[in-house]
């Protein structure tokens, strides 16, 4: 007999908020789970595997739309290794671009911090600091 878990049991097991499960269902990322005799949602092992995949894919930076697309292709048995290769390559390029943007932001902040340190060492510890306004305009 397969396991049947409630929303709270699944949420606890996967470290998710129960509302997240309802949200995934509402937007169509996952199918509606079965209901028990009392009308409560119950999840089987296959549902748990899908929800675990979603959580892991989100941790890797995939959007819910991208995840839904992957799950749809998989359910149609048309998810090829080539398709996954292209999705992973695209995701890596997006991440690399984001890393470059963050490195530039860090460099910009470091420059402002350096100016701040100079002003502090020149006795500018007190009073209104307008350094951010000067640097951000």
From Swiss-Prot:
Gene Ontology molecular functions: DNA binding; DNA-binding transcription factor activity
Domain of life: Bacteria
Stored PROSITE patterns: HTH_MERR_2 (PS50937)
A Pfam family the protein falls into: MerR_1
Signal peptide positions (record): none
UniProt KW keywords: DNA-binding, Transcription, Transcription regulation
GO biological process, one term: positive regulation of DNA-templated transcription
Coiled-coil zones: none
Residue ranges for the DNA-binding region feature of this UniProt entry: 8-27
Domain HTH merR-type: 4-73
Name recorded for this polypeptide: Uncharacterized HTH-type transcriptional regulator slr0701
Lineage: Bacteria, Bacillati, Cyanobacteriota, Cyanophyceae, Synechococcales
């Amino acid at each position: 007999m397969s396991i049947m878990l409630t929303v709270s049991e699944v949420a606890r097991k996967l470290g998710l908020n129960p509302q997240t499960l309802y949200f995934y269902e509402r937007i169509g990322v996952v199918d509606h789970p079965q209901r028990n005799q009392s009308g409560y949602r119950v999840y089987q092992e296959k549902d748990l595997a899908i929800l675990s995949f979603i959580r892991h894919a989100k941790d890797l930076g995939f959007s819910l739309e991208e995840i839904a697309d992957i799950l749809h292709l998989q359910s149609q048995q048309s998810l090829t290794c080539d398709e996954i290769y292209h999705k992973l390559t695209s995701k890596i390029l997006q991440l690399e671009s984001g890393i470059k943007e963050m490195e530039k932001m860090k460099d910009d902040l470091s420059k402002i911090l350096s100016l701040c340190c100079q002003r502090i060492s020149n006795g500018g510890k007190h009073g209104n600091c307008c350094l951010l306004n000067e640097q951000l305009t």
